[in-house]
Curated annotation (Swiss-Prot):
It is found in: Secreted; Bacterial flagellum. This is Flagellin. GO terms for molecular function: structural molecule activity. One of its GO terms (cellular component) is bacterial-type flagellum. The keyword Membrane does not apply. Keywords: Bacterial flagellum, Secreted. Belongs to the bacterial flagellin family. Flagellin is the subunit protein which polymerizes to form the filaments of bacterial flagella. The keyword Electron transport does not apply. The lineage of its organism: Bacteria, Pseudomonadati, Pseudomonadota, Gammaproteobacteria, Enterobacterales. It comes from the Bacteria. NCBIfam families: PRK08026.1. Individual Salmonella serotypes usually alternate between the production of 2 antigenic forms of flagella, termed phase 1 and phase 2, each specified by separate structural genes.
Amino acid sequence: MAQVINTNSLSLLTQNNLNKSQSALGTAIERLSSGLRINSAKDDAAGQAIANRFTANIKGLTQASRNANDGISIAQTTEGALNEINNNLQRVRELAVQSANGTNSQSDLDSIQAEITQRLNEIDRVSGQTQFNGVKVLAQDNTLTIQVGANDGETIDIDLKEISSKTLGLDKLNVQDAYTPKETAVTVDKTTYKNGTDTITAQSNTDIQTAIGGGATGVTGADIKFKDGQYYLDVKGGASAGVYKATYDETTKKVNIDTTDKTPLATAEATAIRGTATITHNQIAEVTKEGVDTTTVAAQLAAAGVTGADKDNTSLVKLSFEDKNGKVIDGGYAVKMGDDFYAATYDEKQVQLLLNNHYTDGAGVLQTGAVKFGGANGKSEVVTATVGKTYLASDLDKHNFRTGGELKEVNTDKTENPLQKIDAALAQVDTLRSDLGAVQNRFNSAITNLGNTVNNLSSARSRIEDSDYATEVSNMSRAQILQQAGTSVLAQANQVPQNVLSLLR
């Protein structure tokens, strides 16, 4: 080996090995401090790509497990609501069985029907208000897709159904006997509604004249109970003409009039009935809205083919119905043109009136034209058909209404086979509850499977990217020893060129 000074090859070799051991020591320390075998792609390029795919899959499956738990929660929420609906249906069935007993009086049947109506209303409330995170679960038919996997198409569907008295076929459930309207009814501007059994009797013209005073001529009277509960009497003709506040004495069966309080009802109309008359408790009050511009709606009526429509004979009225229990039910707005009423909507805030001119004909085809209040095909008119319940006239397949200015109920029918209908409703609820129970079991199974998959994928990823501490500690110890030895050897290698100096002495 040549003796040279400029190049110390032994020192260079030692430095190179020292650098390698230092790099190995740095890698071992990094892996021990991070716990990962792969801290960057240079550590294991292929392993890093594989581990990253494992990570994406694991994260997706973990979220899918949470999704499945949400699916269980929404199914449990829906099933809980259905349980309450079932409880109400069970009570309705119990009441229907009770109503079938021949010992019930009409008053008993009325009470039973009233509770049935309340129970059905509660079913509708539960159906319309039960929600999960803003999603109404029983208000309409709906399919909720729950993602239970890390890839597209890995889903479980929850089929939700609208559950209400209508979809259960019980919205027209009636356990009362059929009835026929009385001969006499209250008439308000030719809009007639016949119903009810309780009556009151207005006194004769003579009694009314005596109460008002001898100055009245052509006296006629009818007591109309408006929404504020006040009775009024309309007196026509003579110096005493006007509308008076009145009270009705249930004991004496007489109408008493306050002669000091003659109230001009510019916004109300009462129908005159001559002589002694029987008036049902199912009365209609017509209230005219003041200050409403009817020019536009009159033009709409004319455009719809209604002759004689102008702003002077067109007004907005609001019809109210009072059932035999004294409950006032708002019948909605209508446009009065002459003796006819047309369905309309009224914006209280904007003081705007709009005629309802769309209706469905007998073939179910949407048509355009003025919709008369009481029309059998119209979708906008509202009437009260049975006590405590409001329907669209077009929905009443067991009621017959005359179109035009008069609205008259001819008859109502007792529901045939009510227990059979209730049993069918219970079966419908049970079917949906069974489906929800089954889908909860599917979610539980999916969650268990997802947990097993996540565990196995995590183990596989760990073998690829996690540090083996036994190996890395061994590598670190080896690198440290090599560092110490290399440093010592490098010092000796750097002394080799000094041997050449001995040749120069």
